[in-house]
Amino acid sequence: LKNSHLHFDTSIGVKKPESIRNKQQACPFCAREELTNLIEVDGPIILLKNKYPVLENAYQTVLIETDDCHGELSTYELPYLHKLLQFALRNWLELDRTGKYESVILFKNYGPLSGGTIAHPHMQIIGLNDINYKEGIAEEVFEGIDIEEKNGVRLTLSTKPKVGFYEFNIDMDDSSYNETFGVHLQKSVHYILNNFPFKASSYNLFFHHYNRRIYVKIVPRFVTTPLYIGYGIPQVPNNLHWMADDIKSKYFSDSGSA
């Protein structure tokens, strides 16, 4: 039987460590010798079962990206970033292919407004027993103003964002990993954290497998508008073309700064 809502176990939730705002909290991901239920290890990259499985009817895993607690995706060396993304995408798609779950999600939280609790760089892969996330996704949320198209990889700025305001999309063919995908992803995140027109300290990455393509939606996070919270109405800003030109000039022109 399919479901529309995930059920959250508060008795587990209250035990979760919080190290984004609480800097005195010991980082559980740094104590690598104490980690349990490891699934796969590739050098500093570790996939393991989530110690605090707060979601019912779900298989929850955590992907620790690095052994550097203060690392951040926009500053990883490119070979390392490609290795990390290939590791994440492979494990996500393999779990989906098992057919055990209604759908499988791969996402990342970064920063105090992202909804995350642990500051150490990580992603999550979650198998949902009775929810198909794809049923709530319209193709139009991936459409937008072209920023860069190269080697079969496209970067756009949403004209019909899912939640509202600014959402970047990158897509590539699902047959194999394309390094341009990683380059575009890193540049987009760097733009959000360093050159955004408003101070941005948080973002989410949401990966989607749709029509034989891999998408990542990159969402800078601010306090969510009440129009979306209360009524589900996304807002579209009137400076999208300016922003597309801004990131293009800073990151994708010959004289770009990054």
Model-derived segments and spans:
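Active-site microenvironments that recognize anionic phosphate/pyrophosphate groups
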Residues: 1-79, 83-91, 95-114, 118, ...
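Hydrophobic (often cysteine-bearing) scaffold residues that line and stabilize catalytic clefts
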Residues: 181
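Conserved, mostly hydrophobic/aromatic
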Residues: 122
